C-alpha cells in the first residue's frame, strides 16, 4: 500500500497538488498504512501500525467528518463486550474535513467471504444465530440498534488470536455507521436511503425501511438476522427472491422454518424481539435431549396429526397453557422441539390461516381462474368442517418450565363423564362430608348402586332400570328374570300403579331445593382421569382423607421454602403452612378445616411481591397409583411419587389475587 501511495504522489504535479486533499496525509505522519481492508459508501478501512510501536496493530476507518461520525463514536464507546469491535481513539486532520476512528484489528474473515467458499452446517448455523442474538440483546439493553446487520459486518475471529482456546464461535459485529438509538428516526432528511444503502445492504433491510423509510425499534435487526439465516442456509440467490410486501421465499420443510416465521413478520409490532428469540428451545441443548428421549411420541404425532393434540403446561406465567391440534402448532403458542441433526425436520406446522392466505393470493389472477379459486375456497371450508367434527383420540401433556420440557405424558380419552359405578362409589365417600351430586334422581341412583353391587357383572347397563324395579318390588337377593317374566303380567302390574303412589315423593323438588349450588360437583382430575371433589366456600364439606401423613411442600431447588406444608406430628393431627403471615391448615378428626388466617398475605414470589390467598391449592391423592399432586387454577401442576414430599415445578408459581381450591381423589375413602 505504501508503494502504491508513493507512486500516486509521484504522478501528481507538485505545484498543483494540495496535500491536504489526501485523506491519508494526516494519518501517515504517525501510522504506517499496510493495506486496505474494506471500502464503503462513506469511507475506507485500513490496517495500520504505529511508527514508534510496530507491534501495535489496529484498523483505521477514514471517513469525511459529519455529525454521524460522532454518533458512531458515541455508540462504540458504550460497547464493552467481546462480541463488538473495540474502540481506541478518534483523530482529525487539521481542517477537520476527515475523521479517523482507530479501532481493534480483527484477525479473521468476514461471514461474506466464508459463505462464498463454504456451506455452513445446521449445527454451525444454530451456534452463529445464538451468538448474534446475544449481541443483539446486549445492543437492546444499551438502547442501540445496528441497522446495517449483514454478512460483511460480521467478523469471525481466528482462534489463535483469542486468549481462550476453546471451540466456540468467536464473532464480532463491526461498522456502526448507520446505528441509531432506539425510537430515533431511522432516515435523516439530509441522508437519502439511496445514498446510504448499497445493493448488498438493501437485501437485508426490513420492509418498513424500503417502503416507508421509517422504523424506530430493534425489530429491524431481527429481520436482517432472518435474511442472514436464509443466506447461510440456502445462499444469496434464495435471499434475492425477497420482496418488500411479502415474506422471503424459502423451502417450506426446513429445520429453520419456524425461526424464520418469527423473524419475517412484515408487521414490525408482531416481529419477535431478540430477548424472546434467544430463549427459543431451538437453542437449548436440554430440549434436544428431551426430543431424543421422547422421539416415539413425536413420531406418533407426525403420523396422527389429525387425531391428536398437545396440551402444554407452561409453568412460567399464569394463563399460558394452550391446547391446539398438531397441525395448528406454531411457536407463537407452543414451543416444539427441534433437532440439530442432518435430515431431521420439525413437525409440519401449517395453520388453517396460512392455507387460507395462500388460497386468497389466487384472487389476484385472471378472471378465468376465478372458478378454480371459488372451488378451492369451498374445499377449504369443507376441510375446516371435517376437522371440527373429528373427535380427539389422544392427548399429550407436556410440562414446561424455563423453556425446558420436563415431561411428556400420553393420555387416552382424558375428558369423559364418570360411569354410574364411579358415581356410586363417589356418593359413598361423600357421605361423611354431607355432599352429593346435584341430580334430580338422587334416590334412584342410590337404589341403582345397591342393585349393581348385588347383581352379577354380566348384567348390561341397559337393564339397570329393570334391576331397580325388581329391588323395589322384592327384598330377596335371588333374582330370576325368566321366572318373573311369566308372572310379570298378572303380579307386577298392580305394583306399577304403586309408583304413582310414590308420586307424592315427587314433591322431592324440595330436594331440588338444595339449589345446593353450594354443594360442589365432581370433576375429572386431568392427571389421573378419576372423579375428584372440589371444595366450595364451605371448607368443612371436604371428603375424608388419609391422616398421619408427613407432607412437605417445597420448591424444586429448595430455595427458602417460600411455602411449606408439613405435618406437626402432634396428637391434634395439625397440618400447617409456615410463612410470615402465620397461615395454617388444621386437620381435625378425618376432615380438613381451614383457618380464617388463610385470607392474610403470603410472600410466595421470589422477588418479594405479595400474593393474596383465599384458600389453598388443589390437592390430589391417588392411593392406588401412589401419586400425589397439587394443582392451581391456572393448571400449574406439582406432582411426585413420594409419600413424604411434593416437588413444585415452579417456585412461587401461585399468582396474585387468585382463588384456590383443594382436590381429593375418590379412591381414598375412610380408613
Swiss-Prot record:
Alphabetical keyword list: ATP-binding, Kinase, Magnesium, Membrane, Metal-binding, Nucleotide-binding, Serine/threonine-protein kinase, Transferase, Transmembrane, Transmembrane helix
GO molecular function terms attached to this record: ATP binding; metal ion binding; protein serine kinase activity; protein serine/threonine kinase activity
Cofactor: Mg(2+)
Biased composition (Pro residues): 491-513
UniProt xrefs under InterPro entries: Kinase-like_dom_sf (IPR011009), Prot_kinase_dom (IPR000719), Ser/Thr_kinase_AS (IPR008271)
Protein's membrane topology: Single-pass membrane protein
GO cellular component: cytoplasm; membrane
Enzymatic reactions: L-seryl-[protein] + ATP = O-phospho-L-seryl-[protein] + ADP + H(+); L-threonyl-[protein] + ATP = O-phospho-L-threonyl-[protein] + ADP + H(+)
Binding site for ATP: 37-45, 61
The Protein kinase domain, residue ranges: 31-283
Enzyme class label: transferase
Active site, UniProt feature: 148
Gene Ontology annotations of biological process type: smoothened signaling pathway
EC number: 2.7.11.1
Gene3D superfamilies: Transferase(Phosphotransferase) domain 1 (1.10.510.10)
Transmembrane parts of this sequence: 369-389
Stretch list, region Disordered: 410-523
Family classification: Belongs to the protein kinase superfamily. STE Ser/Thr protein kinase family.
Name under which the protein is recorded: Probable serine/threonine-protein kinase DDB_G0286627
Organism from which the protein derives: Dictyostelium discoideum
Amino acid at each position: 500500500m505504501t508503494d502504491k501511495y508513493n507512486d500516486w504522489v509521484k504522478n501528481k504535479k507538485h505545484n498543483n497538488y494540495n496535500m491536504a486533499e489526501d485523506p491519508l496525509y494526516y494519518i501517515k505522519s504517525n501510522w504506517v498504512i499496510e493495506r486496505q481492508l474494506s471500502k464503503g459508501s462513506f469511507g475506507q478501512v485500513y490496517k495500520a501500525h504505529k511508527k514508534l510501536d510496530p507491534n501495535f496493530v489496529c484498523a483505521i476507518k477514514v471517513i469525511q467528518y459529519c455529525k454521524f461520525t460522532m454518533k458512531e463514536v458515541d455508540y462504540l464507546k458504550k460497547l464493552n463486550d467481546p462480541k463488538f469491535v473495540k474502540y481506541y481513539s478518534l483523530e482529525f486532520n487539521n481542517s477537520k474535513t476527515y475523521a479517523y476512528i482507530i479501532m481493534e484489528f480483527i484477525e479473521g474473515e468476514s461471514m461474506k467471504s466464508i459463505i462464498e467458499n463454504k456451506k455452513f452446517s445446521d449445527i454451525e448455523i444454530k451456534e452463529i444465530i445464538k451468538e448474534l442474538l446475544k449481541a443483539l440483546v446486549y445492543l437492546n439493553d444499551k438502547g442501540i440498534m445496528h441497522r446495517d446487520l449483514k454478512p460483511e459486518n460480521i467478523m469471525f475471529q481466528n482462534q489463535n488470536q483469542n486468549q481462550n482456546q476453546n471451540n466456540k464461535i468467536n464473532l464480532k459485529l463491526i461498522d456502526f455507521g448507520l446505528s441509531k438509538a432506539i425510537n430515533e428516526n431511522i432516515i435523516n432528511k439530509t441522508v437519502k436511503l439511496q445514498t446510504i444503502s448499497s445493493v448488498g445492504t438493501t437485501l437485508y433491510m426490513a420492509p418498513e425501511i424500503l417502503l416507508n423509510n421509517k422504523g424506530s425499534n430493534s425489530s429491524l435487526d431481527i429481520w436482517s438476522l432472518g435474511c442472514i439465516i436464509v443466506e447461510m442456509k440456502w445462499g444469496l440467490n434464495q435471499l434475492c427472491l425477497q420482496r418488500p410486501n411479502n415474506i422471503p421465499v424459502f423451502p417450506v420443510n426446513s429445520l429453520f422454518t419456524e425461526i424464520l416465521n418469527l423473524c419475517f413478520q412484515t408487521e414490525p409490532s408482531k416481529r419477535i424481539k431478540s430477548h424472546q428469540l434467544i430463549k427459543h428451545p431451538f437453542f437449548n441443548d436440554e430440549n434436544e435431549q428431551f426430543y431424543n428421549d421422547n422421539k416415539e411420541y413425536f413420531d406418533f404425532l407426525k403420523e396422527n396429526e389429525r387425531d391428536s393434540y398437545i396440551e402444554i403446561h407452561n409453568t412460567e406465567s399464569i394463563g399460558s397453557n394452550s391446547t391446539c391440534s398438531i397441525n395448528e402448532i406454531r411457536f407463537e403458542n407452543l414451543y416444539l422441539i427441534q433437532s440439530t441433526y442432518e435430515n431431521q425436520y420439525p413437525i409440519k406446522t401449517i395453520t388453517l390461516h396460512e392455507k387460507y392466505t395462500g388460497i386468497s393470493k389466487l384472487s389476484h389472477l385472471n378472471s378465468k381462474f376465478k372458478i378454480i379459486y371459488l372451488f378451492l375456497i369451498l374445499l377449504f371450508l369443507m376441510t375446516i368442517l371435517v376437522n371440527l367434527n373429528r373427535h380427539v383420540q389422544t392427548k399429550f401433556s407436556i410440562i414446561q418450565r424455563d423453556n425446558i420440557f420436563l415431561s411428556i405424558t400420553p393420555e387416552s380419552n382424558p375428558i369423559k363423564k364418570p360411569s354410574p359405578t364411579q358415581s356410586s362409589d363417589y356418593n359413598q365417600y361423600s357421605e361423611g362430608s354431607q355432599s352429593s351430586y346435584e341430580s334430580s334422581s338422587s334416590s334412584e341412583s342410590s337404589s341403582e348402586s345397591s342393585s349393581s353391587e348385588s347383581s352379577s357383572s354380566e348384567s348390561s347397563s341397559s337393564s339397570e332400570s329393570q334391576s331397580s324395579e325388581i329391588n323395589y318390588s322384592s327384598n330377596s337377593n335371588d333374582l330370576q328374570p325368566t321366572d318373573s317374566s311369566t308372572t310379570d303380567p298378572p303380579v307386577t302390574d298392580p305394583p306399577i300403579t304403586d309408583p304413582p303412589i310414590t308420586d307424592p315423593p315427587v314433591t322431592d323438588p324440595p330436594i331440588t331445593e338444595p339449589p345446593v349450588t353450594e354443594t360442589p360437583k365432581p370433576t375429572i382430575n386431568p392427571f389421573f382421569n378419576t372423579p375428584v371433589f372440589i371444595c366450595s366456600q364451605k371448607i368443612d364439606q371436604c371428603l375424608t382423607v388419609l391422616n398421619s401423613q408427613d407432607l412437605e411442600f417445597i420448591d424444586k431447588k429448595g430455595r427458602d421454602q417460600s411455602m411449606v406444608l408439613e405435618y406437626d406430628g402432634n396428637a391434634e393431627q395439625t397440618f400447617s403452612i409456615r410463612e410470615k403471615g402465620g397461615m395454617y391448615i388444621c386437620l381435625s378428626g378425618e376432615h380438613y378445616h381451614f383457618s380464617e388466617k388463610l385470607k392474610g398475605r403470603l410472600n410466595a414470589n421470589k422477588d418479594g411481591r405479595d400474593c393474596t390467598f383465599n384458600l389453598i391449592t388443589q390437592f390430589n391423592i391417588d392411593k392406588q397409583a401412589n401419586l400425589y399432586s397439587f394443582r392451581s387454577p391456572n393448571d400449574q401442576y406439582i406432582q411426585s411419587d413420594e409419600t413424604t414430599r411434593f416437588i413444585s415445578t415452579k417456585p412461587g408459581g401461585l399468582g396474585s389475587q387468585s382463588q384456590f381450591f383443594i382436590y381429593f381423589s375418590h379412591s381414598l375413602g375412610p380408613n
